[in-house]
Regions:
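Glycine- and acidic-residue-biased ligand/ion/polar-headgroup-sensing regions
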Residues: 78-135
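Short acidic-glycine-tyrosine-enriched beta hairpin
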Residues: 134-150
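Short solvent-exposed loop/turn micro-motifs enriched in small/polar/acidic residues
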Residues: 66-67, 114-116, 139-141
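Generic N-terminal segment detector
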Residues: 21-86, 111
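Short, charged beta-turn/beta-strand-edge "cap" motif at the junction between a beta-strand
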Residues: 152-155
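Bacterial Sec-dependent N-terminal signal peptides
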Residues: 1-22
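Surface-exposed beta-loop interaction hotspot
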Residues: 158-214
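Short, surface-exposed loop/turn motifs at beta-strand boundaries within globular domains
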Residues: 74-76, 116, 214
């Protein structure tokens, strides 16, 4: 739920790795022509003690977040959390639901929307783009965020300049309550100064989607 979970900060990539390796991870499946997903199961603490480096990478490293013209999701059984990236180029991309959210992948997603029982946080880390939610458009520049509440039916993302496409990093969790869709700029974020220069960790944490902000 939003009040306990959806905090999008610019340190959000702690869960994501962009390094390349030859090790084959979890199977990637296609939901439609441009939407891909993979599923990560929860890890037993005793099992994790015996993981090799390759196994750790398989379980916890998300290598493919962004790809031109694609939406890529990783669905983890930890809190049924979704981590994803959308990079629209020549055409807008509609955010559709994915089969594993419903337990039985064989039943498909016909008649279902991504946010029927979920909420979504988006932050743009690329060029200028637009997120259209049920017909209402929100322009997102670099480091601007959008919270989308439970129940939204149609979400479409697009880039304003194909040469510099938007890159929408996304988090989604289950939700029992609907909150209004809201755009958040960097200036409107809860900005927290942390660390010290002498300890090489001086930084500012920008909390974009958090209770009291969005």
């Amino acid at each position: 739920m939003k009040k306990s979970f959806l905090t999008l900060a610019f340190c959000c990539f702690a869960y994501i790795g962009f390094a390349q390796c030859d090790f084959k991870g979890y199977e990637v499946k296609a939901e439609n022509a441009y939407t891909n997903y993979n599923v990560r199961w929860a890890t037993g603490p005793e099992d994790a003690k015996h993981y090799t480096t390759e196994r750790l990478r398989k379980e916890y490293l998300i290598e493919k977040v962004f790809a031109p013209g694609e939406v890529n999701w990783t669905y983890t059984l930890y809190d049924r959390f979704l981590i994803g990236g959308a990079e629209p180029t020549n055409a807008p991309l509609k955010l559709t639901s994915i089969a594993p959210l419903y337990g039985d992948e064989s039943k498909g997603t016909s008649g279902r929307n991504l946010l029927d029982n979920r909420e979504l946080g988006i932050i743009n880390i690329g060029g200028e783009g637009t997120v259209t939610v049920d017909g209402k458009s929100y322009d997102l520049g670099f480091q601007e965020a959008l919270y989308i509440g439970r129940g939204a039916k149609e979400i479409v993302v697009s880039s304003k300049n194909v040469a510099e496409p938007a890159k929408f990093y996304m988090n989604s969790a289950c939700a029992q309550t609907s909150y209004p869709t809201k755009k958040v700029t960097l200036k409107e974020a809860k900005n927290i100064k942390a660390g010290k220069m002498e300890e090489s960790n001086d930084r500012v944490i920008h909390q974009m989607i958090i209770d009291g902000v969005a």
